[in-house]
Amino acid sequence: MKLSLSFFCLLLSSVLLSQEHQVRFDQIDVVHYEFEMELNDENDNIDATASVSLIFKEASTKFSLDLVGLTDGKGMTVKRVLTAKNQELRFEHSNDLLTIYTEQAAGASGTFIIEYSGIPKTGLIIAKNKHGDRTFFGDNWPDRGKNWLPIVDHPSDKATVQWVITAPDHYKVVGNGELIEEKPLGNGRATTTWKSTVKIPTKVMVIGAARFAVEESGKVRGTPISSWVYPQDEKNGFHDYALAVSITEWFINTVGPYPYAKLANVQSKTQFGGMENASNIFYSENSVRGDRSAEGLIAHEIAHQWFGNSASEADWHHVWLS
């Protein structure tokens, strides 16, 4: 009886969530996100500006994005919302929804700038790794991205994304897509920019920042494949993750062209054994052993670049695909 009741509640929650998102799908189409974010070593607070570009499918007076609000010291606080022309807009932030008021005609497009800050409850894992070094890893699957990003947090809602991450310069930053720039600021900090011109779901839209040793393992059909591991695990990590080259080649020959600009294989603090983030897979930090025992895990996560990322779920009841 308890099991049946729990299943019914879960089913009802899924139905209501799907209905809520369907209203948004009928109203707006997000085409691009840009996240500018400041990370620091003093505390777990992030300061961020999100630029969300979208098209209005129907005449609207408001629209909503998912963003977890502040409770018990954690969550995001929105400072202000602006248009691309620097006009302040009225907004409400409650029940983990950011509602922005704006008069728009059907077919109109616009970019909306959201300034916010806070300590993520989850979604962005800020923690010491097994060697005691501080790290930052996005861990959005399946719907935890809204804990640190204002987004339409649904597996079928794809958009392009650009990350502009400023952090202490002892960190290397990895993100979706192609590396655009690494810019030292001369004050012990640096800004790293990554951009995906391929639309991806928010569940696999992430960055990672840590002390990394990085090696290009090889190229397959022009696609660079790299390994990002903790410096203490450099020898074993490069040996283990180099398997990704032959595995990726097999999938390209068997399935079809690789869908993204690169493939980075990253030792991380993900709560999962592995997480198939688009073009930068995050593996458990314990996946590095030096004996290539993670071959099955690596193949599994690389397969998701096609199945789960490029071909993604239409709704929550399909989430088994990833």
Task: Give the predicted meaning of each segment.
Residues 16-51, 55-57, 130-135:
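N-terminal, polar/Ser/Thr-rich
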Residues 22-25, 106, 115-162, 215-217:
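Glycine/proline-rich low-complexity spacer/linker segments in large multi-domain proteins
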Residues 51-72, 149-153, 161-168:
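Surface-exposed beta-strand/loop patches in extracellular or lumenal glycoproteins
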Residues 62, 79, 85-106, 139-146, ...:
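Aromatic/His-enriched, Gly/Pro-containing loop or helix-boundary segments
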